[in-house]
Amino acid sequence: MDLIETVNACVGLQKRVLKLAPNTNLNTAGQSVLNDYNALASRVNGRTYALLDQTAVYTPYTVNAPIISLAVRISTDDYDDMRSGIDSILDILAAAIRTEGSRPTRVIERRVIEPNVKQLVEDLKLKSLTSEISIANMAAVDTALIQPEIIETENPLFADIIEQVIHRPNASMTGGNIRATLGRWSGNKGIVTCMSGMDSEHRFTVDFKTRTCGIINVVYAPTAGVIMIPMPTGRNREGHLIDVSAEMMAENFAIDFMDDDDIIQTETGVGVFSFPMCNRIRFRINPWDMQKHNDNLWTVNLANWPQGTSPRQPAISFLFETRRTFTEGDYQHLSRCAPKVQYMMDTIFPETAFTNRPVVDWNVQSLLTSSSQKTWCQKIAMLIAAYAAKI
């Protein structure tokens, strides 16, 4: 969208201006910044545009961007004028975002329609296709101007829950002859408890939103004393647990990194692992088996475990966390820049600053993932994200 591209370019110029310093000789790059600023200021200085302010009222905004005299050395006054000039332009662009964002849209647009905003974009005549904030680049991706950006995602996992319970007919009231895998995960973390009331392997998968690579950290956590077991049929039962993580060996805990049904890489034990591009993780866990029992690793409460009548059942709990995960950016993923966009939404672009707004919660994630008024929501998020890249 041309308004996003204009914001990108003006934000880029602001950063170049702020890299300069007053009372300092300008090198070639500094002279280029001065020339680019003067070219922009000469086109819009003194012009007035009626745009929405932060109270959603049309207000005349006048650009105050003085032209700076060319010199080898920039004075303090000239530097302050240049800095305030680019800030004045950015303030008007913020008003343009509020104005254009208030106009509902149903399809992806390459050009703004709002007359006052369109005039501002034509007067500035400065555009840049990409932003430092990945959310703002999604408009260029949607129109096939650039390839999807590789981003570090903060929420690679689908939110999900596992309640996997297998039991024999003679299951006891304390969890004997029951294999239960209970847990949940969302964002980039999950915690799971595996209770082995019988000799059987726990096996379950955790799905990524899309093909992802990165680092995963897995660590044992203290197991609860008693858990509720949601039985497939009949009343729920209690699982009385004993933490056996002290006797867990590497071969008792395996992690398969899978691309659909193909195993790409397998790691054993807990720890920190780098994993290749995959779209699901499969855990294979065996907290307790007959071999451990025959090796006399059991305690008094596990003496009758093979018969399923022991008062407590062997169990482990573990926490897993994906870290530094990278994937192709899309609307499902939140990158590290999302909180900065949210800050701008809460300060410069509150929902009360728009004369019309989609019926969604006013936060970045809701705008990006809304299925209602989808294109309009995404347009607002991308416009604000482009502005959020400013210093």
Curated annotation (Swiss-Prot):
- Assign the protein's first listed, main location to one coarse class: virion
* Subcellular locations according to the entry: Virion
* Entry keywords, A to Z: Capsid protein, Intermediate capsid protein, Virion
- Provide the GO biological process annotations: fusion of virus membrane with host plasma membrane
Keyword check for Hydrolase, yes or no. no
GO molecular function terms listed in the Swiss-Prot or TrEMBL record: host cell surface receptor binding; structural molecule activity
What does the entry list under GO cellular component? viral envelope; viral intermediate capsid
- Cite the record's note on assembly: Homotrimer. Interacts with the inner capsid protein VP2. Interacts with the outer capsid glycoprotein VP7.
- Function as written in the Swiss-Prot or TrEMBL entry: Intermediate capsid protein that self assembles to form an icosahedral capsid with a T=13 symmetry, which consists of 230 trimers of VP6, with channels at each of its five-fold vertices. This capsid constitutes the middle concentric layer of the viral mature particle. The innermost VP2 capsid and the intermediate VP6 capsid remain intact following cell entry to protect the dsRNA from degradation and to prevent unfavorable antiviral responses in the host cell during all the replication cycle of the virus.
State the family named in the UniProt similarity comment for this chain: Belongs to the rotavirus VP6 family.
Q: What is this protein called?
A: Intermediate capsid protein VP6
